[in-house]
A protein has these predicted regions:
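Charge-dense, helix-prone N-terminal extensions
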Residues: 1-113
């Protein structure tokens, strides 16, 4: 599979809508770029140009996504990537895939009851 079709690729606006649809999610800012938090913890960010997002996955979740969709997901550079931080190019992502991965990142950071 190549890049997502023009009709299905995710825009920064759609990404925001998906992230903010999760319970208690808010948009904030970290080092000058948008981030998305739950319970005060960042679960996702957008880069300055809003062309890709970073999801705070576990290393196991990251590995699963890299195996399932290597053309869409890649580890962040350095120690962050080793911890599970995963970059997703919005132009290659589809809403259903991104929704599922965002939910994982949100669950990782959401307050435990």
């Amino acid at each position: 599979m190549g890049a997502a079709s023009e009709e299905s690729k995710v825009t920064a606006r759609q990404f925001r809508k998906l992230a903010l649809s999760l319970p208690d999610a808010i948009e904030s800012e970290h080092m000058g770029h948008p981030d998305f938090r739950v319970g005060g913890k960042i679960f996702a960010t957008l880069n300055f140009e809003e062309t890709f997002c970073v999801l705070m996955l576990t290393p196991e979740q990251q590995n699963d996504w890299l195996n399932r969709a290597p053309q869409r997901f890649k580890p962040c550079k350095g120690a962050w990537g080793l911890r599970g931080c995963t970059q997703v190019e919005l132009t290659t992502a589809t809403a259903p895939t991104l929704r599922q991965a965002l939910k994982m990142a949100w669950t990782n950071k959401a307050p435990k009851e």
